[in-house]
Amino acid sequence: MITVVDLYHVLTAVVPLYVAMTLAYASVRWWRIFSPDQCSGINRFVALFAVPLLSFHFISTNNPFAMNLRFLAADTLQKLIVLALLALWCRLSARGSLDWLITLFSLSTLPNTLVMGIPLLKGMYAAAADVDSGSLMVQIVVLQCIIWYTLMLFLFEYRGARLLVMEQFPDTAASIVSFRVDSDVVSLAGGGGGAAELQAEAEVGDDGRMRVTVRKSTSSRSEAACSHGTQSHSQSMQPRVSNLSGVEIYSLQSSRNPTPRGSSFNHAEFFNIVGNGKQGDEEKGAAGGGGHSPQPVVGKRKDLHMFVWSSSASPVSERAAAAAAGAVHVFGGGGADHGDAKGAQAYDEYSFGNKNEKDGPTLSKLGSNSTAQLRPKDDGEGMAAAMPPASVMTRLILIMVWRKLIRNPNTYSSLLGVIWSLVSYRWGIEMPAIIARSISILSDAGLGMAMFSLGLFMALQPRIIACGNSLASYAMAVRFLVGPAVMAAASIAVGLRGVLLHIAIVQAALPQGIVPFVFAKEYNVHPNILSTAVIFGMLIALPITLVYYILLGL
């Protein structure tokens, strides 16, 4: 039976977190103490130092040889059940899509265990002699950081790769045998690597197979160079050394944007290949009008074709120009105009990489602002769009996921924490005091700073409920009803009973995790829904978890 003293212990553990969040919110919204730039600096510090060191502290002090495998099995089974049901829904339902699979999986299975779960569950079940609820929450955090967040990145990059292939290679994707991604591109979403656009170059060999190179567009490169104070475009944009001799190059570039934009075609490299003598004629022809397509340059070697385009190009002009030039038809799709979303400042504060990346193309879909639907649409003959071989897509996705992981400080803190805990508890080695205190001086402030940062984020948003009341209600139902229900079923299935079962259910009813929102904003997959789940969910999480705590204790 839950007593008043038990409730007081719970409030003692949780209310200070809400005090820090409220102070941050008031400092921005009411008192105007912090400017958006100052909030960005605070949140950047939290994302890069406070939270990773807090994770390292909890993980490194947890005994990996005393982990409750049955509890972890219940958590894993819950996520696998949800993932399987969502995949089945996407396969059988016309309304199912990869976007909604990712969003619903995040809402139902990825709570804010590190910041809210550890202090809340410690306050609720501190009196349980045979159960260390804090240690159980740390074990959940380890799985989240190492396995489930990595799975989320895999799904997001898979989505980005599908979108890139479907837009740029709608008819010839099955002929792609390899992808090469430049080192400065760290994401396939919305241009990746902090650029507004991606440029894809396809080389077609004698066997008809395509080898695609993905890089930042030259226009975005020149803009970045100009922003760093280069003297001129010609000085900042040195042409790449080309090993092509006598190849045919088709550059088809048009834009839906009404404002002029620098072309992504590298004229310097083009004229180095075909000769400088025709430079004036080519420029004159290019300026003559959009109705004329570039003519292919016939060289001595005709066994290789290179197609260069930008992800923002118009599909209509590309198809017409390709037909006029007699080129192989490999163009299709195109990105929509990029708009600056309100609250983008707040996203930068939580981002671990791509800090200057803009939102990708958006499309209204069920009241949210996710990017285009990724379910392949059937053509007139009912045939679905072909995709590259699974091995090619898998290698591309793994490369991009690896680049994201190595730029995330939480990856290092989690892995180092696990390694140190294994060494420490296996051989009884203690961390040197000078290192331990250097870490603790920041990790001790991690919880408070994380909640303070969340309050700043809430204050910077124009609306608490950004996705509309109906979608917000739907998201809250998934977060606080569906997630705990599936966790209860999974826990009972693996044999959890008593206090362990209660902890598993209450843990599943925690507010939405922040990291899934960061991913959703970066990849533009229903960010408004995840934003509402984080903000509004945090406000109603305490009474909801208390209701679960009281009902389970009856």
UniProtKB/Swiss-Prot annotation:
Segments in the Extracellular topological domain: 1-6, 60-68, 122-135, 436-438, 497-498
Write out the residues that bind (indol-3-yl)acetate.
51, 112, 114, 149, 514-515
Determine if Disulfide bond is one of this entry's keywords: no
> Which topology term describes how it sits in the membrane?
Multi-pass membrane protein
Q: Which residues lie on this side of the membrane: Cytoplasmic?
A: 28-38, 90-100, 157-414, 460-475, 520-533
InterPro entries the record matches = Auxin_eff_plant, Auxin_Efflux_Carrier, Mem_transp_PIN-like
Q: Where is the composition biased (Polar residues)?
A: 228-240
Tell me the keywords, alphabetical order: Auxin signaling pathway, Membrane, Transmembrane, Transmembrane helix, Transport
Its annotated compartments are:
Membrane
Q: Which GO terms describe its biological process?
A: auxin export across the plasma membrane; auxin polar transport; auxin-activated signaling pathway
One annotated GO molecular function is: protein homodimerization activity
Q: In which tissues is it expressed?
A: Expressed in roots and shoot apex. Expressed in roots, stem bases, stems, leaves and young panicles.
Q: Region Disordered: which residues?
A: 214-240, 275-298, 352-385
- List GO terms (cellular component aspect): cell periphery; endoplasmic reticulum; plasma membrane
Task: Give the quaternary structure.
Answer: Homodimer.
Quote the function comment for this protein. May act as a component of the auxin efflux carrier.
Q: Which family does it belong to?
A: Belongs to the auxin efflux carrier (TC 2.A.69.1) family.
Q: What is this protein called?
A: Probable auxin efflux carrier component 1b
Q: Could you tell me which species this protein originates from? A: Oryza sativa subsp. japonica
